[in-house]
């Protein structure tokens, strides 16, 4: 087994090993020393929409020293696809909750993460129960990733208006946190309200699983700083990652981040294949975790095409040898 070490941020002179504090908001700090976590994306679609393949890939990633496996989500895909949309309508995607539960039940240490759930399309009371159950099944290994969504056809099919989806998402996050953490859950919001109820089991992680907000829009960045333990950017090269990390730090200097959220963990799925030098460039920007595509060298239209599971396993081994090795 290869340990998840060996990729570290460069030293930062005096005070090395400590994060910088940005006006009450602790953000992954460029130049600080920390272990880079490595995750694997798409554990629920394409090749891994087959349950046996998903389990094989997750177990192999766990044995290779990967820190986490991540699902993607669309409840429905547009057909025909709009210009620039690379996921074919025929792409099989296992439901996020089903996939996380499957993988959690067949692994023991690797974290299971939703990257991301399109939160405005969900019922937050039901989703809170589902995610709490995943956290129990996984013995506290859940990372709950949420996004506002962007596919209009998906919202129309679900009967949810796209307008106001960001406000709806924030309302839902507050409601789910109440269900996870309050002794007597009560919440009064714009889109969801409840009182006189309880919901068990509570998540294994107390007071709640870590929440990650996905997206690159200014509203998503602000939401991550103000409401979440982490931020997730998808398909980003090094320059774009640097721009967004800088925007997060600027927001951190302007906000009053709730102290209980702790440091904001920065996660990125890189655009294209990686080598050690490129990983180091992301690390220098303060990125805490890289979540790799199963076919990182494929062109965008081909990234979702099913491939033999053995090819994904070989890609995992390559990362373990070239990036995770000490």
Segments (PLM) and residue ranges:
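N-terminal beta1-alpha1-beta2 module of alpha/beta enzyme domains
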Residues: 29-106, 207-209, 314
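Active-site mouth loops of central-metabolism enzymes
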Residues: 41-51, 116-125, 207-216, 265-273
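Short, acidic/polar
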Residues: 49-60, 127-130, 215-223, 273-281
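Hydrophobic faces of well-ordered beta-strands that scaffold small-molecule active sites
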Residues: 38-42, 69-71, 112-114, 142-146, ...
